[in-house]
């Protein structure tokens, strides 16, 4: 083999690999590496993997080949919005389940004779090495003359000196994957090895081979020869990865577009922008101008042009361009989509589908006292749209009535992705912390203000506030959420009951709203579907709580009520005594 080197200027590596059956008749190890094109390099990274089939099985070589090939192909088919951890873990788990099923189908119930192997994988993305490990193959970092193991062996030693794997690919229907993330810098050297190699080497010899060899492939071959001469009787595989360069900035393809393309001058009615004939302006604010346009293929679309004030705001322009990227990756009836591109663009703008209808804000003004069923129907459609975001590891982060549209057929769609968090993009190029709160204060979850961990439950909070406002016309905490600065402030928030004389509703419905907007994210619903269900019928928690005595359900209220009753009784008795 020869060195494999990436061609992208941002992340560049050299890879050397070697494998050998050793003194055995068959090689049950398998290995591979993939340096993708520049687009995939940015969003997915470089993958290096090896696997070692167990020696007691005649089909373990199939397992080794399957898991490595799955990673080198299926990993790059996962959504760009996913993190490396999510993408690789899903692929590994799927391959594990398939291999386990193959063994069961073939009647190989004993794991010692099934499609079973170890796995060591490294994915390099931006300035981080993501390590995935199952079994007793290893990943190392070479520092000078020292070898630092970055993985833990998943095996136990027997009295005879043999070992038994406690974790392996294909041994069970599910697999526990060891994961670790390590920062990388130029000059770092990593090694992936099977036990036939690392049980028969020394750090000094490894460092010497890598330093003296003309190529990393030659170094890998020399390391195998040394292990064989040292008495290895197993299959042997080693991969050497040298980091030649890492990204010097957090620039993404969005930043490159923002740097190279100009913001177009605001078009006049009837003018044409790259094949889009402008019909009229639909909306304008400090961030953008939106125009109704007719594409050259006859489709009616919306053209969104950033405001000139954004020209020096790199992060603002990145978020603007990400709106188009997000719209093209969320194929959902309840999320704003984007039409096929007409070709290269001469400037910075995005094109989305045109929604003929009204915002939820306008609908709420037109329907100040909606029926419960109307509210449920709208919220359930929003939930279906939100699921599309969360399945792609995205958070909308600015869910509010102005960012929800109802078309003329009553179909609800989530719009405006300028504040959306995309885990996979954030992993490659983090946004600056000083950007602050991106959403609208009244609808933003308190954990954003207190500096605590945000999650999909943060979007649930926003949805709960919208539901509360649709039913009452006011907000559950007024303006208090925007004043939160720390966890103590968050805990002081007090929910205002939605149920009163002006807004009659079942107590269980008020309970569902209170749970959705609870100040503590952990005490909100466990799934969006749970919130949807609780909008239609009482939750089991609510029903059970109704049957708990007041003294247990709310001791403070019980004793206050009892004390008040006793005080009233004493007053009555005293009055009677003096008559």
Where are the model-predicted features located?
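PP2C/PPM-type serine/threonine phosphatase catalytic domain
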Residues: 1-302, 306-322, 329-331, 343-349, ...
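Conserved HxN/HPN-centered segment at the entrance to the catalytic loop
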Residues: 331-339
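Conserved short submotifs of the Hanks-type protein kinase catalytic core
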Residues: 345-359
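AlphaC helix of the protein kinase catalytic domain
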Residues: 360-370
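Activation segment signature within eukaryotic-like protein kinase domains
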Residues: 378-379
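Protein kinase catalytic-loop region centered on the HRD/HxD motif
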Residues: 384-394
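C-terminal lobe helix-coil module of Hanks-type protein kinase domains
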Residues: 442-542
């Amino acid at each position: 083999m020869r060195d494999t080197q990436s061609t992208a200027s941002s992340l560049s590596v050299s890879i050397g690999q070697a494998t050998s059956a050793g003194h055995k008749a068959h090689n049950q190890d398998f290995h591979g590496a993939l340096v993708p094109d520049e687009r995939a390099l940015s969003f997915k990274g470089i993958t290096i993997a090896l696997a070692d089939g167990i020696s007691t099985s005649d089909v373990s070589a199939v397992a080794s080949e399957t898991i490595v090939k799955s990673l080198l192909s299926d990993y790059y088919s996962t959504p760009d919005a996913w993190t490396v951890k999510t993408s690789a873990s899903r692929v590994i788990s799927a391959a594990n389940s398939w291999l386990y099923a193959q063994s069961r189908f073939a009647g190989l119930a004993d794991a010692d004779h099934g499609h079973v192997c170890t796995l060591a994988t490294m994915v390099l993305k931006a300035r981080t090495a993501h390590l995935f490990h199952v079994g007793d193959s290893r990943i190392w970092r070479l520092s000078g003359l020292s070898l630092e193991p970055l993985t833990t062996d998943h095996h136990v030693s027997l009295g005879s000196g043999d070992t038994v794997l406690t974790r392996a690919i294909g041994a069970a229907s599910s697999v526990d994957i060891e994961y670790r993330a390590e920062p990388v810098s130029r000059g770092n050297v990593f090694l992936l090895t099977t036990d036939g190699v690392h049980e028969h080497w020394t750090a000094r010899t490894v460092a010497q081979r890598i330093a003296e060899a003309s190529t990393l492939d030659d170094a890998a071959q020399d390391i195998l020869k040394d292990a064989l001469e040292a008495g290895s009787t197993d299959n042997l595989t080693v991969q050497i990865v040298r980091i030649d360069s890492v990204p010097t900035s957090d620039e993404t393809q969005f930043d490159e577009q923002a740097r190279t393309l100009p913001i177009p001058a605001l078009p006049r009615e009837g003018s044409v922008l790259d094949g889009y004939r402008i019909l009229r302006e639909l909306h304008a604010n400090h961030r953008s101008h939106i125009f109704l346009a007719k594409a050259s293929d006859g489709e009616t679309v919306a053209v969104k042009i950033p405001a000139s004030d954004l020209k020096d705001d790199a992060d603002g322009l990145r978020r603007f361009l990400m709106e188009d990227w997000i719209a093209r990756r969320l194929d959902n009836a309840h999320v704003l989509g984007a039409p096929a591109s007409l070709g290269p663009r001469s400037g910075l703008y995005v094109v989305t589908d045109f929604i003929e209808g009204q915002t939820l804000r306008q609908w709420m003004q037109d329907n100040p006292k909606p029926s419960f069923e109307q509210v449920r129907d709208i919220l359930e459609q929003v939930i279906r749209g939100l699921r599309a975001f969360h399945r792609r590891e995205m958070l909308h982060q600015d869910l509010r009535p102005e960012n929800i549209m109802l078309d003329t057929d009553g179909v609800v769609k989530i719009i405006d992705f300028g504040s959306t968090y995309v885990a996979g993009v954030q992993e490659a190029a983090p946004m600056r912390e000083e950007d602050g709160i991106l959403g609208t204060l009244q609808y933003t979850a308190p954990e954003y203000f207190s500096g605590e961990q945000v999650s999909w439950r943060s979007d649930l909070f926003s949805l709960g506030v919208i539901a509360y406002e649709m039913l009452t016309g006011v907000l559950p905490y007024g303006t208090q959420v925007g004043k939160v600065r720390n966890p103590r402030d968050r805990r002081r928030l007090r929910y205002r009951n939605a149920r009163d004389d002006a807004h009659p509703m079942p107590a269980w419905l008020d309970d569902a709203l209170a749970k959705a907007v609870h100040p503590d994210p952990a005490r909100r619903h466990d799934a969006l579907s749970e919130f949807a269900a609780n909008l239609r019928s009482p939750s089991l928690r609510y029903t059970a709580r109704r049957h708990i005595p007041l003294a247990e359900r709310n001791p403070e209220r019980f004793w206050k009520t009892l004390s008040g009753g006793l005080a009233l009784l004493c007053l009555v008795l005293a009055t009677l005594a003096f008559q």
